[in-house]
């Protein structure tokens, strides 16, 4: 298969398949030579902050001289973003080659797996054959039943901020969701967690039951260009008032690795934190346009706090998926804006712009409907010369807007 055929094939694989669980993935990986058993992982779960935490960790390890794989989801502009080594996306040719090989083994051995499990298998084989020293592995959804949890062990299991999302699969309370996330911890292993005060006792109890050495990150104090953690000041390139606390988790991850002999220096830590880029996390793509992929209530609250910290007039461009808690999210973020431009994407799951408008219409906030995201952005920019335009509500919308700026 060529690159285009490989991408088409990946997207043709069912999102879910039976039997549920990882039995077929384990079978597939066995026939691939179990590459995951020959790799070292930092395994990252959580509702919010996984990608940023993974990106900062990977950047620090790369600077420290480790060949570092990074597996994340979803992608914003090109599929290749999901599989990276030392910050470089997998090439089109490599992706086509590995998809073709894994597809052949899967079909030959009748080890059919879901789309995400298939991509996970592709990444394991790629990272192993490219001789990665360490892989930063982001959970797709949940933890316990996630395809990434097929790994036997990790150097560090990481629990980022936990909140309500994917409730139809993970549970209707943060307590239930926390238990799912904790499923990535391994007997006798090492774990680091975001403070997660609401479910701290659940995380502690689970860690104790597995004899896991658990560290909760302490409080990070934001500064103008970074943050202070444990009386030491660090630089930080990622914007957003929520990023210093994610960075504190990263510092505890590196501390845990150093206890295992990795010897990452303070200089490499500071360099990594000051050179990390991570798309669509309070990312300014121009002097007036910021994009943020937050799509659950905790992510939206964090975005709201970051927008208010700018002390500028705000105009929103918003789209959301129907399977999210969209009413709560829209009602939370809209009051920060002088006006809202409701838009939508050409996706079955996408909420109509009219529904967004209806929700905002009762809030006495000017709202305009533009079904085309590009038009919505331009109209938002034209609405006020001095305002900041925030594109939010969906990572898919963020990806569409980033493409516009790359074309420029």
List where the protein language model places each region.
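Positively charged, low-complexity intrinsically disordered leader regions
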Residues: 1-40, 168
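Residue-level signal for inorganic ion chemistry
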Residues: 10, 47, 68, 136, ...
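ATP-dependent carboxylate-amine ligase catalytic core
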Residues: 22, 26-30, 34-37, 63-152, ...
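Nucleotide phosphate-binding/pyrophosphate-handling subdomain across enzymes
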Residues: 37-38, 134-137, 145-158, 162-166, ...
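A conserved segment at the C-terminal end of the G1
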Residues: 44, 52-69
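Extended acidic/charged loop-beta regions that coordinate divalent cations
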Residues: 119-169, 200-233
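C-terminal helical cap/extension that packs against the catalytic core
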Residues: 192, 196-215, 224-226, 297, ...
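A glycine-rich beta-strand to alpha-helix segment
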Residues: 376-406
């Amino acid at each position: 298969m060529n690159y285009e055929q490989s991408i088409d094939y990946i997207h043709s694989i069912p999102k879910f398949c039976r039997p549920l669980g990882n039995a077929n993935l384990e079978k597939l990986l066995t026939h691939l030579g179990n590459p995951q058993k020959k790799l070292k992982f930092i395994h990252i779960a959580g509702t919010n902050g996984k990608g940023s935490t993974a990106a900062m960790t990977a950047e620090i390890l790369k600077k420290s001289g480790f060949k570092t794989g990074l597996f994340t989801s979803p992608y914003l502009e090109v599929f290749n973003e999901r599989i990276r080594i030392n910050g470089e996306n997998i090439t089109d040719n490599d992706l086509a080659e590995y998809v073709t090989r894994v597809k052949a083994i899967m079909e030959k051995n009748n080890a059919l797996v879901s789309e995400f499990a298939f991509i996970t298998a592709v990444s394991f084989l790629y990272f192993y054959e490219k001789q990665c020293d360490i892989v930063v592995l982001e959970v797709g959804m949940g933890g316990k039943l996630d395809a990434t949890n097929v790994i036997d062990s990790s150097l560090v299991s990481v629990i980022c901020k936990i909140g309500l999302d994917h409730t139809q699969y993970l549970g209707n309370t943060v307590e239930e969701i926390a238990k799912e996330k904790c499923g990535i911890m391994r007997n006798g292993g090492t774990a680091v967690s975001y403070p997660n005060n609401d479910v701290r006792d659940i995380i502690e109890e689970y860690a104790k039951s597995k004899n896991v050495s658990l560290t909760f990150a302490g409080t990070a104090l934001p500064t103008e260009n970074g943050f202070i953690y444990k009386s030491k000041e660090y630089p930080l390139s990622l914007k957003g008032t929520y990023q210093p606390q994610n960075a504190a988790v990263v510092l505890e991850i590196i501390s845990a690795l150093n206890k295992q002999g990795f010897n990452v220096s303070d200089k490499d830590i500071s360099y990594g934190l000051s050179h990390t880029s991570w798309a669509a996390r309070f990312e300014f793509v121009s002097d007036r346009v910021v994009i943020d992929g937050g799509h659950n209530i905790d992510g939206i609250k964090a975005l709201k706090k970051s927008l208010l910290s700018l002390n500028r007039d705000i105009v929103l461009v918003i789209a959301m998926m129907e399977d999210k808690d969209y009413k709560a999210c829209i009602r939370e973020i809209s009051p920060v804006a002088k006006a809202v431009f409701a838009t939508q994407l050409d996706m079955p799951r996408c909420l109509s712009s009219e529904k967004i408008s209806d929700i905002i219409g009762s809030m006495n906030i000017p709202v305009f409907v533009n079904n085309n995201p590009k038009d919505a952005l331009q109209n938002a920019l034209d609405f006020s010369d001095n305002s900041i335009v925030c594109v939010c509500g969906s990572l898919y919308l963020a990806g569409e807007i980033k493409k516009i700026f790359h074309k420029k």
